[in-house]
């Protein structure tokens, strides 16, 4: 599913303030991480990242390429590619608990200031 900024804002509403992260920071980070696309897959040197939050099979989820993953979120990685982002959000909260928002490289580089543009402006 390809989300819009406003759709994603509604879906991520319960993360607003979680781990002291403001919603616009998260929306910005997800834009630069996956382009709001639940089917985004990025191959890295030693791991693959899945879905909206680009969750890695090295630590967080299990895939056929990563049977030795610690699988902290106790889930198969392909679950992060469907339209239901409930499980993605649960895993993202674990990542926020353990690693913080800077787990997503885009955050520090692109999403720490001028965040007004990431707010959903309701007509």
Swiss-Prot record:
Intrachain disulfide bonds: 6-120, 28-111, 61-77, 73-91
Name the record gives this protein: Alpha-lactalbumin
InterPro entries noted in UniProt: Glyco_hydro_22, Glyco_hydro_22_CS, Lactalbumin, Lysozyme-like_dom_sf
Role, per record: Regulatory subunit of lactose synthase, changes the substrate specificity of galactosyltransferase in the mammary gland making glucose a good acceptor substrate for this enzyme. This enables LS to synthesize lactose, the major carbohydrate component of milk. In other tissues, galactosyltransferase transfers galactose onto the N-acetylglucosamine of the oligosaccharide chains in glycoproteins.
Alphabetical GO biological process terms: defense response to Gram-negative bacterium; defense response to Gram-positive bacterium; lactose biosynthetic process
UniProt feature coiled coil, ranges: none
Domain C-type lysozyme: 1-123
Keyword line: Calcium, Disulfide bond, Glycoprotein, Lactose biosynthesis, Metal-binding, Milk protein, Secreted
Species for this entry: Papio cynocephalus
GO cellular component, one term: extracellular region
Family: Belongs to the glycosyl hydrolase 22 family.
Binding site for Ca(2+): 79, 82, 84, 87-88
Secreted is among the record's keywords: yes
Tissue-level expression: Mammary gland specific. Secreted in milk.
Compartments, as annotated in UniProt: Secreted
Organism ancestry: Eukaryota, Metazoa, Chordata, Craniata, Vertebrata
Glycosylation sites recorded in the entry for this protein: 45
């Amino acid at each position: 599913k390809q989300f819009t900024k406003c759709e994603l804002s509604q879906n991520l509403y319960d993360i607003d303030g979680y781990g002291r992260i403001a919603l616009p920071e998260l929306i910005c980070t997800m834009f630069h991480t996956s382009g709001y696309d639940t089917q985004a897959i990025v191959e890295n040197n030693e791991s693959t990242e899945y879905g909206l939050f680009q969750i890695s099979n090295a630590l967080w989820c299990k895939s056929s390429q990563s049977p030795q993953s610690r699988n902290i979120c106790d889930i198969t990685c392909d679950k992060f590619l469907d339209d239901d982002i409930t499980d993605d959000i649960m895993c993202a909260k674990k990542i926020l608990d353990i690693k913080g928002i800077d787990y997503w490289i885009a955050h520090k580089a692109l999403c720490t200031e001028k965040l007004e543009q990431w707010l959903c402006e309701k007509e």
